[in-house]
Swiss-Prot record:
Name assigned to this protein: ATP synthase subunit delta
Organism in which the protein naturally occurs: Magnetococcus marinus (strain ATCC BAA-1437 / JCM 17883 / MC-1)
This protein's record includes keyword tRNA processing: no
Reported function: F(1)F(0) ATP synthase produces ATP from ADP in the presence of a proton or sodium gradient. F-type ATPases consist of two structural domains, F(1) containing the extramembraneous catalytic core and F(0) containing the membrane proton channel, linked together by a central stalk and a peripheral stalk. During catalysis, ATP synthesis in the catalytic domain of F(1) is coupled via a rotary mechanism of the central stalk subunits to proton translocation.
Membrane topology: Peripheral membrane protein
Amino acid sequence: MRTFAVHESTIAKRYATALAELASELNILDSIRDELAHFQALLAESPEMHEMMVSPTVSKESQHKLISTYLEYAKPNDLTANFLRLLIDKHRMALLNDVATAIVRVVDERAGRIQVKVETPKALTPSLVAKLEKSLADVTGKEVSLEISEKPELLGGLVIRMGSVMLDDSLRTQLHRLKEIMKG
């Protein structure tokens, strides 16, 4: 199963790279990101529509009719519309989330930004959030956009995720390591 997931991720990155290059040439990369995010949100809100768009048992014709209705409503630029049609034609609509995530990374990278996910056992004060943002900006040399979530099971400390890097300095992990050391 892992091989399939890695394969899909690689394909999604290829689609995202090609789309990002075209969007950059047309100077509409931010627009593409926003339009894909909008469609992605729509699919997340409607499990029935999501299932219809990704199911191999639903005909391309039915999927194209559905996407045409969406395109008439949302009126995205031609590149987004054609890209969504291409995903249908190639039976790759299931990759939309990965492609959209990769597009966000490309846009952020070009703008000198990085998305950082932080898990904490309890809410951080605004001053701690500001210090954390500054520290991460100093380390990465980029503007940091934090997504903070509370995870009481961490007990203390932080878990920080930046792209493929994870720093786990949670009390839960420290206690687990101590337990392993004591086992021998």
